[in-house]
């Protein structure tokens, strides 16, 4: 059996006297997509940030690519091939699109940087058309495409995408999902924290549902039927992008 590329074991996270995660465990196989679902405040973003080294766990262990990264700083984890795309756009709004991409690949070998930027633009051609435009002046959907392009430009082993469709119209969100699908087809492992529950489950191989910081349910994505969704998510179950085809940016 292939060893997990990412393993979270009995993870606790506290913010002062308030505990956000309680003994959360998760195993992610290489090349798969795991959907992390839950209502607002369930702990999805806390889990993502703890894995990425942005929030220190109070207990538990995180292993990535065979190495314990529990206490590693975020920049070191990123260099190991784990890229985190934060909720609310991971871009530099006062830099141009192309400068955002240049910043993303700054740690790559100089000779490899042009090809890395070209690959990123190939995934989202609209970014090539906006290359000299300030990132902050892009539409919300274009900003999220840029955030994803920045993450994928460095050819990561694993991407944690935290609520990438947040604030986007369904049709625009679908273009972001297509970018994630493309990344998955290229062999990149994805941990997807998402509000579009059904669309996330369509894309995912497995699913973990958080409820108030605890693991409420885990299993194959195809087994997360409506009963499971209603029981653990309730009002958090947002409609699919396809079901809101008339949505506007």
PLM-predicted stretches and their roles:
Residues 16, 72, 97-115, 123-125, ...:
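ABC-type ATPase nucleotide-binding domains, specifically the catalytic core motifs of the NBD
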Residues 37-39:
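The feature captures the beta-strand-to-loop junction immediately N-terminal to the Walker
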Residues 52:
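Helix-to-loop junction immediately C-terminal to a conserved catalytic motif
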Residues 60-67, 80, 113-117, 217-219:
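Conserved ABC transporter NBD signature motif
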Residues 134-138, 142:
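Conserved ABC ATPase signature
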Residues 151-152:
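ABC ATPase C-loop
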Residues 214-236:
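Conserved beta-strand-loop-alpha-helix hinge in the C-terminal portion
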